[in-house]
Amino acid sequence: MKAAIIYDSRTNTTEKAAGFIAEGLKKAGEIEVRCFNIDNVDFDYVTGVDMAIFGSPTYMASVTGKMKNWLEVNVRKLGLVGKLGGAFATEQYIHGGAENAIKEMLVFMMVMGMMVYSGGNSYGKPVIHLGPVGMSQNIEDFRELFVTYGERMGKQLLRKG
């Protein structure tokens, strides 16, 4: 199985979160995973994945304009219809709108025909309703949350298999 994590990152915080998720995916089993900044996506690789996870810093309680534009321009080229999808976000402030950013990406994926997943509260704590959120000032403190999310997403991908 193959997965891609595609993100925008201004200060490398969202990039670090993507790396944590990749750790979790690898813990789940035999999953090849690669992370891409939206400036350097390998379209050949991504068109062959079974799952795509998107991440964005939160800006004005939403995804960055750069991420929104990238999704609108590029997502059709990726052939993600029917593929598993998920989303995550980082933010600078508590209640900075990261859940709105995650919802925006999830809705976009659903409109494009992807099957979205998070695990919700079915696995117990940590409960990850829509997708993980980490504070940029201390992203390392959220490492385990992102790793857990990656592992849960990976297990779902392998079940879907």
Annotate each predicted stretch with a short phrase.
Residues 2-3, 9, 13-16, 20-161:
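FMN-binding flavodoxin-like domain, especially the glycine-rich phosphate-binding loop
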